[in-house]
Regions:
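Non-heme Fe(II) oxygenase metal-center motifs and adjacent flexible, charged/small-residue loops
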Residues: 1-175
Length: 175
């Protein structure tokens, strides 16, 4: 899939453990989309996208210091400067939580996601000649993916329900 890169074991298990200890202390809130509450919990840094009211972008708290080393690792993986990432979304997926088909909002550019703890199935689809073309990727613990170009703009993605606790740390550039 053009514009998609996947890297297993981007970080060491000890770094994952340290991150998870910090993530557990974040002020998560239930994800809400047009009155629907998802099973996942989220917290945004740098910028926050509000789905209510037609979708608005607001300045959010600065990216926490404990995420800066991971931001640098994610930037290196994506072959860009760390400061290119202006938005971070941390998502907590409890057992049974997933996310439906979507594309990240147009205000965001390139995307790097880092997966912690439980593995998940990251699904992609796009309509080609009236048929859905599909790709599934098993995102293991400590892995990362990068979406740019067609993978970012032409393909939708979703995550099947997870069996155990999973954290996703999504770094995004701004357009």
């Amino acid at each position: 899939m053009e514009g998609f890169r996947y890297q297993p074991e981007l970080i060491e298990p000890a770094f994952e453990d340290a991150l998870v200890a910090q993530l557990r202390e974040l002020p998560f809130r239930e994800f809400e989309f047009h009155g629907y509450k998802g099973k996942r919990r989220v917290v945004s840094f740098g910028w926050k996208y509000e789905f209510a009211g037609g979708g608005q972008l607001h300045k959010a708290e600065e990216i926490p210091e404990f995420l800066i080393p991971l931001k640098s690792i994610a930037a290196s993986f994506a072959r860009m400067e760390p400061d290119a990432f202006q938005h971070v979304l941390v998502t907590e997926y409890g057992p049974g939580a997933g996310i439906g088909w979507h594309r990240d909002k147009a205000v965001f550019g390139e995307v790097v996601g880092v997966s912690l703890l439980a593995p998940c199935t990251l699904r992609f689809r796009r309509k080609m000649n009236g048929k859905w073309e599909r790709v599934n990727v098993l995102a293991g613990p400590r892995s990362a993916y990068h979406l740019t170009g067609p993978a970012r703009s032409e393909w939708q993605h979703s995550i099947l329900r997870v069996d155990a606790l999973r954290y996703s740390i999504t770094f995004r550039t701004m357009r």
